[in-house]
Amino acid sequence: MDEVVSTASYASTVGSMTFRKTDHHKNAIDYEVAGLMWLAAARPDGAGIVEVLDHGKGWLTEPELSTGHPTREAAEDFGRRLAHTHAAGASHLGAAPDGFVPDDGYIGRAPLPLPSEPISSWGEFYAQYRIEPYMDSLDADARAIMSKLVDLLASGALDHDEPALVTCPAARTHGDMWAGNLMWTPDGVVLIDPAAQGGHAEEDLAALSVFGAPFAERIRAAYNEESPLADGWEDRIGLHQLHMLIVHCWLFGGGYVDQTVAIARRWV
């Protein structure tokens, strides 16, 4: 895969600063813009989403966000709001955001399959579209473990319900909710850089801990109060982290492989 060419610059506009992002990889900006607008449509009850001020072929402009300090109160407010973003729903697992013609999206620099047709179960979807596409980066021993997990997922044995407020076939997810994509502003958490899609809500919640988002436990606790999670959700955090981790295996290799395989072993 060719490396994504992505740059950023800042400009002052009437006392405020804007952030211009360019990315010349096929459809990357179109996907990001559609995702930001789709997630923002869950407002006013949903999570804060950075505004798209303008965009064109291969570029978008956003406001530069003022940074604040993470607090328990902001984390809990974000958890409750995220529950409502998820509840806005999607037509099916892997659904592209409205306004984006189904094609591969991106999670970071990695391609992200966005199937246009519904898949029969979460486990089948997760195995076929969120684990298998990245397994070619693993050595034979790691692939053997992951293949066992893929088979178990595809069987439906690990399927579980969405949170209580999600009544659509899939949640409206950010899709790349690692710590760096949560901006702690004076007005609360604002999300940036999505890989927006129809997904399982627990994946966003699990991703918070992959790189240690501040107050991740308080975010999940407040979410669970607002939209109760299915029994056993805490045990599934690792399972829902596997997509993000195997993407990092595909991109970077190294210690991510050991971490990914260790989680998979717990299930097989």
Protein language model features and the residues they cover:
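An alpha-helical support segment within catalytic cores of ATP-dependent transferases
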Residues: A90-R172
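Hydrophobic alpha-helical segments that form the core
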Residues: G238-I246
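ATP/Mg2+ or Mg2+-diphosphate-binding catalytic cores
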Residues: H248-V268
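ATP-binding pocket architecture of kinase catalytic cores
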Residues: S12-S121
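Short, solvent-exposed loop/turn segments at secondary-structure junctions
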Residues: H25-K26, H55-W59, S66-G68, I131, ...
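Active-site Asp-x-Gly
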Residues: P115-A127, V166-R172, A179-D235, G254
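Short strand-connecting beta-turns/loops that link adjacent beta-strands
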Residues: K57, P186-G188, L242
